[in-house]
Amino acid sequence: MNQTLEEVVSLARQCGCGHRHYDIPIEQMVVGREAFARLVAYLRHKRYERVAIVADDHTFAAVERSLCDQLENGSIRYTVCLVQPDENGDVIADERSIVQVLLETPDDVDVLIAVGAGTIHDITRFSSYKMRIPFISVPTAPSVDGFTSMGAPLIIRGVKKTIQAQAPIAVFAHTGVLCQSPKEMIAAGFGDMVAKYTSLADWQFAHWMADEPYCPFVHQLTEQSLQTCVDHIDDIAAGGEQGIRVLMDALLQSGIAMLLMGQSYSASGAEHHLSHYWEMEFLRQKKRQVLHGAKVGVSTPIIIEHYQRVFWPLLNELEKRPKSMDEATWERLKANTASIRELLESLPSPERIRTMLAKVGGAIAPEQLGIDPQLVERSLREAHRLRLNRFTMLYFLNELIFVE
């Protein structure tokens, strides 16, 4: 991170935005080759004698020798729950995976350890919350910014829902393990960071148009983590330890920013809603899943194109109020027109986003992910309904301007 955890907490206390800043429950956050040794020391300090590792076949294989040797040398007893994939070979954060973890975790376990990427963390986060025990994060790839999140995006009866659960009490990310993660997962992590361009724009817009809680400090933290990745794109693309550490630190800082606000506005906007919509459609069609970061990376330039194509004509024709919009909202839109123009102009071009994604080895078009143009168009009309309490420019356009 650009600041230490202690510095972030201190700066948050000095913030004058007027909104509540939540306590950060994370006691330690270690990114480096000493991570697993520090994990064992932390477990002993907390007097956790029995732990349960939650992983899948691939993530457990990535750490089995290095992590388990450390646990055994530290006299830490552990069990392992390997979450089983579905019929397509995907590990899904759904009811089946959660029930498996609940059934296989011994009653006397002190803490769960999530060993994996986003999906394993979501399963562990919710399961530990329901079991009323803490969990520790051990990322095996720098692929998402949700490691430190309280929210668990789950598939419940085929529908994507984000359920507030709990954040990890500590994070131990071994850079040696992270550097060995598949290139597509590193590209996905960069994609999740690139998505902050539109999520931050949506958040600012929601503050202006719907009085959503907004904090300049949290915005700055998120923007800073994004810019650091952009500035070090060559290092990240090279896949060396320096670049991977930069990416991991940025993902963690973005997650800490969400924790401070108690919600994910800073990191998740319309681009995430498109991604969730595509994910649900793939589940319905029983197609193999695509990495979350790959989807939001691809959806970000799509959202930018959509906003610039649709919003500019609207801002140029403010004489007549649409029948679907009340007078107060119309007046607010007119009052904020200059700011909205500036916001749209500040977004990078879709071509620049795609160039950056390609540089780190990521997909740049939905077709590369098996997403056809019809699904993209449908998601632009309907994806905002997955989270109607999240005010975005996409929500505004679909619900208040182009009402079907």
Swiss-Prot record:
One of its GO terms (cellular component) is cytoplasm. Binds 1 nickel ion per subunit. GO terms for biological process: glycerophospholipid metabolic process; phospholipid biosynthetic process. It catalyses: sn-glycerol 1-phosphate + NAD(+) = dihydroxyacetone phosphate + NADH + H(+); sn-glycerol 1-phosphate + NADP(+) = dihydroxyacetone phosphate + NADPH + H(+). Homodimer. It comes from Geobacillus stearothermophilus. The keyword Transmembrane does not apply. Keywords: Cytoplasm, Lipid biosynthesis, Lipid metabolism, Metal-binding, NAD, NADP, Nickel, Oxidoreductase, Phospholipid biosynthesis, Phospholipid metabolism. Disulfide bonds: none annotated. CDD domains: G1PDH_related (cd08549). It is found in: Cytoplasm. Belongs to the glycerol-1-phosphate dehydrogenase family. This is Glycerol-1-phosphate dehydrogenase [NAD(P)+]. The gene is egsA. GO terms for molecular function: glycerol-1-phosphate dehydrogenase (NAD+) activity; glycerol-1-phosphate dehydrogenase (NADP+) activity; metal ion binding. Pfam families: Fe-ADH_2. The keyword Transferase does not apply. Ni(2+) binds at D192, H272, H292. Its EC number is 1.1.1.261. NAD(+) binds at D56, G118, T119, I120, H121, D122, T140, A141, P142, S143, S149. HAMAP family: G1P_dehydrogenase_B (MF_00497_B). Substrate binds at D145, D192, H276. Its cofactor is Ni(2+).
